[in-house]
């Protein structure tokens, strides 16, 4: 869509230009948004013919962000023009696009053809638009659906950054207690260890388990921590984190569980990460009403620490050891597949990235 034959014109901002960044930051601040240029790839701004700022829109990957229109222009076509322009731009690159917004605003996107996937009242709604949808992910799940004789169908979602003996222990336990285990591997490539590497380390590490089916997480089995929160600046951080987890778990419950007939979801007891702790709480709150039992397994430990408390295995300890160049100190935490990879030249780039402080869990 172009802005020809309208009362508006649009410009793409230079995010390396402090003036341009200040322009959109000041505009959004008046509307209650805190603009962070590091969280977007492209930003456009719309003016009327008098040069007044009408609205703005940005994107990060396939996610629309910072879509906002000044109050006095909200009865115009400005919102529709911005969303349509940005969506058409993204659909030239991706097969579909997402937007996160407050539930009370979702109707405006629905009116432009977006479909609501899930809502976590009162903070989040997730909508999508494009040539593909969550139903395509369900079609993929149907291709890996296993034939089972019992209701012992379990699931687990892992990131494995990297794959540790803690992950292996949890997967082996689930496999020993169920007919089938669907192991979802988070696919978003924001971790220090890329998806392809994590997938291969897991595959090699559990090749002895014939009843575990590895599943690509796609764009729907993700980490809620990537969900934007720029429109929630006045909300309590813990509330935002909890609603991010709730939104993610609702997607799993509504779209994944019915396709695969999942009856259990295994999780490790969380002692370190507030995000994972929020996820575990959301699962315990939501999944039982969908017929899914949440089984929390005590995290595997290797001896005790200096204070005689259990020395739990965690991927973060492995990354910390890599950063400190003390990989030999954490060998007991690693299965053969991960250990062999980390001592190979193939891991050099990843180890360097961790030492430079890049990548997250």
Give each language-model segment a name.
Residues 1-35:
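Short amphipathic alpha-helix that is part of the acyltransferase structural core
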Residues 45, 51-68:
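Conserved beta-strand in the GNAT
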Residues 41, 64, 151:
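Short coil/loop residues immediately preceding or within conserved phosphate-binding loops
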């Amino acid at each position: 869509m172009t802005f020809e034959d309208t009362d508006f014109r649009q410009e793409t901002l230079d995010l390396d230009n402090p003036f341009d960044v200040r322009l959109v930051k000041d505009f959004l601040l008046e509307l209650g948004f805190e603009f962070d240029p590091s969280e977007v790839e492209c930003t456009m701004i719309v003016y009327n013919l008098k040069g007044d700022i009408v609205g703005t829109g940005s994107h990060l990957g396939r996610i629309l962000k910072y879509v906002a229109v000044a109050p006095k222009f909200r009865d115009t076509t400005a919102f529709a023009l911005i969303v349509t322009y940005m969506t058409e731009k993204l659909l030239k690159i991706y097969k579909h696009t997402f937007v996160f917004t407050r539930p009370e605003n979702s109707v405006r996107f629905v009116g432009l053809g977006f479909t609501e996937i899930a809502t976590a009242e009162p903070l989040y709604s997730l909508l999508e638009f494009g040539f593909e949808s969550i139903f395509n992910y369900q079609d993929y799940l149907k291709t890996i659906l296993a034939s089972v004789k019992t209701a012992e169908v379990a699931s687990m979602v892992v990131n494995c950054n990297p794959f540790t003996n803690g992950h292996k222990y949890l997967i082996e336990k689930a496999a020993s207690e169920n007919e089938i285990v669907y192991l979802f591997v988070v696919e978003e490539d924001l971790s220090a260890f890329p998806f392809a590497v994590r997938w291969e380390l897991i595959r090699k590490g559990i090749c002895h388990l014939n009843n575990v089916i590895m599943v690509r997480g796609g764009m729907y089995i993700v980490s809620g921590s990537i969900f934007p929160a720029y429109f929630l600046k006045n909300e309590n951080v813990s509330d935002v984190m909890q609603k991010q987890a709730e939104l993610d778990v609702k997607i799993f419950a509504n779209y994944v569980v019915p396709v695969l007939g999942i009856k259990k979801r295994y999780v490790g007891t969380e002692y370190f990460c507030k995000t994972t702790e929020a996820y575990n709480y959301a699962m315990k709150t939501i999944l039982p009403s969908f017929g899914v039992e949440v089984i929390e397994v005590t995290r595997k430990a290797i001896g005790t620490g200096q204070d005689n408390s259990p020395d739990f295995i965690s991927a973060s300890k492995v990354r910390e050891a890599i950063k400190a160049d003390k990989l030999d100190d954490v060998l007991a935490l690693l299965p053969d597949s991960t250990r062999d990879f980390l001592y190979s030249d193939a891991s050099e780039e990843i180890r360097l990235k961790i030492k430079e402080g890049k990548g997250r869990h």
